[in-house]
Design a protein with these regions (language model features):
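Active-site loop segments of alpha/beta catalytic cores
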Residues: 1-92, 101
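Terminal disorder- and signal-encoded targeting elements
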Residues: 18, 48, 52, 137, ...
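Catalytic-face loop-and-helix region of soluble metabolic enzyme cores
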Residues: 77-172
Length: 175
């Protein structure tokens, strides 16, 4: 079944118009982490999708931090960046980065995608700077500043306001 889902998603990704970056939202690595043996297969399934598109690929997890073993297999996946949920579990996300490292590119989920309260650009910049302070040894080629989850379920006006705040907050970051 996992292989069939991966093949289906790979076909979907292959049919996209040209894009620069593909975000693969993957909460199940946190909420229903694969068992031993299945964690490696999950990484291979991610590879199948990532290989189907000529774009940077970000696997963005949320609703917590990834358990250690699935995280290790995700690090082996052929993706450009891993996304972390710094709203639901900032300490666990920092622990994974400090303990196991991460890719050369990173996505920071610093805006709450499940709440209609719109963060200010200053709050967003502070959160990005906080992450940088926690992992100063990591030098990232690209930092994606994003919501911790998709914004799909928010009212349109709130989702758009959060996107505007993200754009403004990213310009205020001083590293």
């Amino acid at each position: 079944f996992l292989d069939a889902v991966a093949e289906f998603l790979a076909a979907e990704a292959d049919s996209f118009p040209p894009v620069e970056t593909l975000f693969m939202l993957e909460p199940s690595l946190v909420t229903d982490a694969p068992d031993d043996g299945e964690d490696e297969r999950a990484s291979e399934a991610i590879d199948t999708v990532a290989d189907a598109i000529d774009a940077d690929v970000v696997v963005h997890t949320y609703w917590g931090s990834i358990p250690e073993k699935p995280y290790a297999h995700l690090m082996d996946a052929d993706v450009d960046a891993i996304g972390f949920d710094f709203v639901a579990d900032h300490q666990g996300s920092v622990y994974n980065i400090q303990e196991y490292g991460t890719k050369d590119e990173i996505a920071l989920g610093v805006v709450d995608g499940q709440n209609t309260l719109v963060e200010t650009p200053e709050e967003i910049a502070e959160r990005v700077e906080w992450v940088h302070e926690q992992v100063p040894a990591e030098g990232f080629e690209t930092v994606y500043v994003s919501s911790n989850t998709e914004l799909f379920y928010l009212p349109t006006n709130k989702a758009e306001a959060k996107l505007e705040a993200l754009a403004a907050g990213a310009t205020e970051v001083s590293l």
